[in-house]
Amino acid sequence: MEIFLIKTLQFFMAISLLVLLHELGHFFFAKLFGVRVNRFYLFFNYRFHIASTYDTWVRRLFHLKPEVVPTREVTETDDNGKTKTVQEKEYVGTEYGLGWLPLGGYCAIDGMIDETNQKLSEETHPWEFRVKPTWQRLLIMVGGVLVNFLLALFIYAMVLYTWGETYVPVQQMSYGMEFNEQGRQMGFRDGDILLRTNEGEFKKFDADLFRLLADANEVQVLRDGTATTITKSDDTSLLDMIKSDPPFLRPRIPAVIDSVLPATPAEEAGLRKGDRLASINGVEIVSFGRLTEQLAKIGDRISEMPADSMKIRRVTITYERDGITDTITTTLTADLKIGFSPVYPYTPTTEEYGFIESLPAGAGYGWHVLASYVDDLKYVFSADGAKSLGGFGTIGSLFPDTWDWHRFWLMTALLSIILAFMNILPIPALDGGHVLFLLYEMVTGRKPSDQFMVRAEYIGFGFVVILMVLANLNDILRWLGYM
């Protein structure tokens, strides 16, 4: 429960910050060009809200008018020339509020199709969005995306300035990598040290390493001190590598004990720091990764025969200590743990940045993250990629189990880039849809009709809702164990 609360709090903190600043981007340019903003809300306020500068949630719930908003009589003339007098709210400034539905936020700009379409047939006013020059309307619409993208670059820069960049150079991983069955069929061998591909050189063990492998035709490795070239015959995608279990590749870590956890099978069996595990149930253990694979197989056997769980969890372990081999028998924990941490044999490298240095470095890293994200979107259009789509549950699960400001800000920056990119897509109801119509107007000199714009907004909104439903449905199905 504690982990769930920590992840949830981090998720809402990040989303609130990103939504607030996104809407402030629209708000800033609207105010800069003299456009009225009727409402500015963090989260949606369907029927009622939590807080408002001139309204109360009780009045909103019971559809009562706000007390403090004055009205005035306005005479309107219809298409037949008939006049009528109506009561209209006077503009008393922007209503700032906090909604209750955390699916986003909004900035109600006067004179926009999707914000005040009930006023489109009325006489225009100089403070309305629709009467402003095209270039001003364009800046108002891209303001949110621009702020989100610049925010991501700034966060990356400050992360580099505060924590630097810590990584292990791939070519210094002296024990090499270990591969799953698919990797071994391609020609890789456990212990291979990755050098380069025809696409570039391996530098760090991160997502870019997998991208290089996925795009490569040839991979050069150091095997037993000799450079060896492997020609990939299998068209393995990045998605295949990420989803494979056991992993397509991982750093090879010796099965040597660094520390024994208290009150665990390892402590009860007398295992100590420095012991090297040689086998489990007679199966040779050459690395910590291979140990985890054998433990996973034990879990599979328990799933097939749950009644024999205690018997299956009883394992025989052979280990070496000071050149002497010995054997113990112990019972794994319910979550199939022995109870020790392995020695990590690699020394990380940390590159530190001054404040000025961090700015271009953060900008460069942000551009790289955006380019990688756009490139990875091609997998969404595959069957497996569509299944991998996730909603709020998936996003929340990406945050760390414990409070870690470093990882929190990295995740927030990534979400900011995703939010910026998704909003600039040319889909009506999103910022990109408005930008598309404005660019059309700038090129042709003709503005799309209001009727067309309204219909396009409805279609775009429907598409976005369907996409959100599917993404969150995937989360539910995964939670229920159907995916």
Where are the regions that the model predicts?
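Hydrophobic membrane-targeting alpha-helices
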Residues: 154-162, 420, 424, 468-475
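PDZ/PDZ-like peptide-tail recognition elements
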Residues: 142-174, 207-259, 316-318, 327-348
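PDZ/PDZ-like domain segments forming the peptide/carboxylate-binding groove
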Residues: 159-203, 243-279, 283-286
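Small-residue-rich helix-interface/hinge motifs
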Residues: 3-122, 422-444
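Juxtamembrane extramembrane loops of integral membrane proteins
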Residues: 112-116, 132, 175-236, 262
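Internal alpha-helical transmembrane segments
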Residues: 10, 14, 21, 32-34, ...
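Functional transmembrane alpha-helices
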Residues: 2, 124-135, 244-268, 273-279, ...
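Primarily interfacial, aromatic-capped hydrophobic alpha-helices that serve as membrane anchors
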Residues: 62-68, 460-480
